A protein has these predicted regions:
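N-terminal cap/lid segment of alpha/beta-hydrolase-fold proteins
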Residues: 33-77
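N-terminal targeting or regulatory segments adjacent to alpha/beta-hydrolase or S9 domains
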Residues: 1-52, 324-326
């Protein structure tokens, strides 16, 4: 296994900045504001798929955002467990066909489009439909924590879970979250803000340890807006402390201590988008039941060799083998 120095560092690294003193009070207050179940529309769609019911869910999120999610439920007389899937930065939720694999094991799947990215959810900024990236990380950081884009996304997730948990066909005690990159971060956020989430799989999670990202000089597509903010708006870094203090409220490593369910994290050691060190800033702050897998030859890319089977097993309790069967 290559890079032993990095492997040694990531096992104890907890990030560059500490959690703000009022962090939990802030998020408890924000969650309380949206604790009443919002009005929503759940419309069934007939796609001629036997044994499965498909729905489109829409509701109004914070700051006039419109949130859209696909919902797939196996036809069952029993209440069904749910897997919440979250997509990568600038992307959109799973296609309907992608969601069907889990229904074979009796699980429902909910896949939310993040507002303002490539799906059907609408950004509350004048209710624009479609892509408003880039700039989602940094949006609102100058104005303060109440204006952060991801604050609203995190609250969308909390409300989504509450809506789905309230459905009569759903087993509210068996909810899981899953995603990669931005989706991995949001899967962790789901567990941190809503204790209904019992299991989480996070593959190379994004949105962590912003100070370290800045120090590394990460100009990859996902983080370049942070780099560009300072290059073109504050080249002398006169606002760095203020910006970092504000972004701390959406830094996923700072939410880690709130997670009570089980967590599995998967990391590619060659990841130059969401650096492994920033991912383990999250992992090492988790106080729950946790485990990680490292893939030394992988970067920030599709992990299709055995990984999908492992994720499926862990979420569904199946026993697909992790090696070639002769």
């Amino acid at each position: 296994m290559k890079n032993p120095a990095l492997l040694k560092e990531i096992k104890t690294y907890r990030g560059r900045d500490e959690v703000p003193e009022d962090f939990d009070a802030f998020w408890d207050g924000e969650v309380k504001k949206v604790s009443t179940l919002p009005a929503y529309q759940l419309e069934e769609r007939d796609f001629c798929i036997p044994q499965v019911k498909c729905y489109e869910l829409t509701f109004e999120g914070t700051n006039e955002g419109k949130v859209y999610a696909r919902v797939v439920l196996p036809k069952s007389e029993e209440k069904v467990p749910i897997i919440f899937h979250f997509h990568g930065y600038m992307g959109r939720g799973w296609d309907w066909a992608d969601m069907l694999a889990y229904t074979v094991s009796g699980y429902g799947v909910v896949s939310m489009d993040v507002r303002g990215q490539s799906g059907y959810s609408q950004d509350g900024l004048r209710s624009l439909l479609g892509n408003t990236v880039k700039g989602h990380i940094i949006r609102g950081a100058v104005e303060g924590r109440d204006h952060l884009f991801y604050k609203d996304v995190y609250l969308d997730i909390y409300q989504l879970i509450e809506i789905i948990a309230s459905l009569p066909q759903v087993d509210e005690k068996r909810l899981s979250s899953y995603g990669a990159s931005q989706g991995g971060a949001l899967a962790l956020v789901a567990a941190a803000l809503n204790p209904r989430i019992q299991k989480t799989v996070a593959i190379y999670p994004f949105l962590s340890d912003f100070r370290r990202v800045l120090e590394i000089g990460n100009t990859s597509e996902a983080y370049d807006e942070l780099f560009r903010y300072f290059k073109f708006h504050d080249p002398f870094h006169e606002t760095e402390e203020e910006i970092m203090a504000t972004l701390a409220y959406i830094d996923v490593k700072n939410l880690a201590h709130r997670i009570k369910g089980k967590v599995k994290m998967i990391t590619g050691l060659d990841d130059d988008v969401c650096y492994p060190i920033t991912q383990f800033a999250i992992y090492n702050r988790l106080t729950c039941d946790k485990a990680y897998r490292i893939m030394p030859e992988y970067a920030h890319e599709a992990m299709n060799v055995f990984v999908n089977d492992q994720v499926y097993n862990w979420l569904c309790g199946s026993e697909i083998p992790f090696k070639y069967v002769k």
